Design a protein with these regions (language model features):
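Active-site recognition of the HExxH zinc-binding catalytic motif
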Residues: 98-111
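Short pre-active-site segment immediately N-terminal to the catalytic Zn-binding motif
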Residues: 82-99
């Protein structure tokens, strides 16, 4: 039985609102402000490398932090160049601090690089490389017992050895990321930035795959 016209309009409005919230979560997020925001930057600033590369970048570029429901991830970057975190998470925990480090690394990339496995692998590798500085027990690796992503250290170690410039390695990285975080949508991303992947398949006359790069990026869930 068809829905009344009013119901269809109501559903459309809900879907439109949901779509806009995914694009611009700042519309309805719980922003981290005041002393809590300063505490996060101070915590990240306790090491020289992260003070300059992350905390300084966040401060200088006026990057905002806010809590918003995530979809199969712990955090994310926004089109307005801000960072979202999962509601209820402690922003001062090593886990969340490492997410902020990860997403800040993304914000330094071009938009198209962020939308690729190449950009994703580089961010994961940076997250692993810098984690010991913010670990619960300083010096511990990410994924080790008692730390963020406990029990997944072997997968992080494998990810750290992969080349972001190798197509084979990027395909391997997709599987490893899902082992670290089941449900993670690494398979939605093209291996290289969308434009580069489109040209790659086009030149091989694999036209369906060329257009599929863009279609998958838009529709993948």
């Amino acid at each position: 039985m068809p829905e009344p016209e009013g119901c269809r309009m109501s559903t459309f409005k809900i879907e439109k609102t949901g779509f806009l919230d995914r694009l611009f979560p700042e519309r309805h997020w719980d922003e981290l402000i005041g002393e809590k925001y300063k505490e996060v930057l101070q915590k990240i600033s306790e090491t020289t490398q992260l003070k300059d590369e992350v905390a300084g970048y966040i401060k200088n570029n006026r990057i905002r932090l806010g809590f918003h429901k995530q979809y199969k991830s712990g955090g994310g970057w926004t089109l307005l160049r801000n960072i979202t975190l999962s509601p209820g998470d402690n922003p001062l925990s090593p886990y969340v601090l490492s997410l902020i480090v990860h997403e800040t690394f993304h914000l330094k990339q071009t938009l198209w690089m962020r939308l690729s496995m190449q950009g994703e692998l580089r961010a994961w590798q940076y997250q692993k490389y810098t984690y010991p500085e913010i670990a619960r027990t300083k010096g511990n690796d990410i994924g080790s017992n008692g730390e963020a992503y406990a029990g997944t250290k072997e997968f992080w170690d494998e990810l750290s050895k992969l080349s972001p410039d190798s197509r084979d390695d990027l395909e391997q990285a997709q599987g490893l990321m899902r082992k670290v975080s089941p449900g993670y949508r690494s398979g939605c991303l093209p291996l290289f930035p969308p434009g580069k992947e489109f040209v790659y398949f086009w030149r091989q006359r694999e036209y369906a795959k060329a257009f599929g790069v863009l279609w998958k990026l838009i529709t993948c869930k």
